[in-house]
Amino acid sequence: MKKIFLQVLIGCLLVSAPAFAADSTNAVKQFMQQVQQAYRSANFLSFHVLYSYANKNQPDNYIDTMSGEVAMNRNHVRFLLEDVETVTNDHYTIQVHKDEKLIYLTTPQQTQLTDPVAAIDSALSHFEGLSTRITRTGGLATLTLAFPPGLAYKNVTMTINEHTGYLQKVVYDMYTKGLVEKDQMVDGGSGGPYQSEGRVEMVFSQYRQGQFTDGLFSGEQYFTRLGQGKYQPTEKYKDYQIFLASPKL
């Protein structure tokens, strides 16, 4: 099940990048730019994210959930999702896999959460037949994307607080093929609980500021750099292996 949540995490806000009809492009860009600016300008912002999965025909019957915590200060981000911790600072993106006792180290990789419109212009010609709609009610703005057949996502709905620009909820209607093992799928009324179409909801809550310092993003708590291509885990992570994913390290 984690594979689905990680797929959604990777795709979060990136799915806002496909081509739009010409008359909707500006409105969608403005919507996403509001989100981008809100998170880019936030100082020491933290919040909670709850992921819930349900089958298409029972959207209120959640069969799996995961929760995460995000802390960010402009382009510095820490994301904790169960046993995986990811930190991005000016020098590294650090991914700590606690169950595997592995520290995965690479050059800084900016998340789509901090730059949700970065890929829009370069992807404008990728898809055709995608429709968009923006609605506003009660201080909330909702962007709905309906994708053409043949893609992993059917629909994506994003709701933001119009005053702050912060995400409140993101809903993905998606196909689960390739994300769920065969023995987990419902087949003729038997087998696992997962169907061929599902829904993932991400609910953002508990927004707060000033609860941490820049030390939260420091690589020094995970490792010591001994020289080019040489890193040693700190005492806390002494039984972890460090994997270097970039020759530039």
State where each predicted segment sits:
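Bacterial N-terminal signal peptides
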Residues: 7-16
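Short beta-strand segments that buttress and anchor functional surface loops
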Residues: 49-51, 78-82, 142-149
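Extended beta-strand-rich segments in extracellular/periplasmic secretory proteins, especially
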Residues: 119-179, 244, 248
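N-terminal leader/targeting segments and the immediate start of mature chains
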Residues: 19-61, 230-249
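Positively charged n-region of N-terminal signal peptides that target proteins for export
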Residues: 1-4
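Short, surface-exposed coil-to-beta transition loops
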Residues: 63-66, 81-82, 89-90, 152-157, ...
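An acidic-aromatic
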Residues: 69-117
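Non-transmembrane domains of secretory- and envelope-associated proteins
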Residues: 164-249
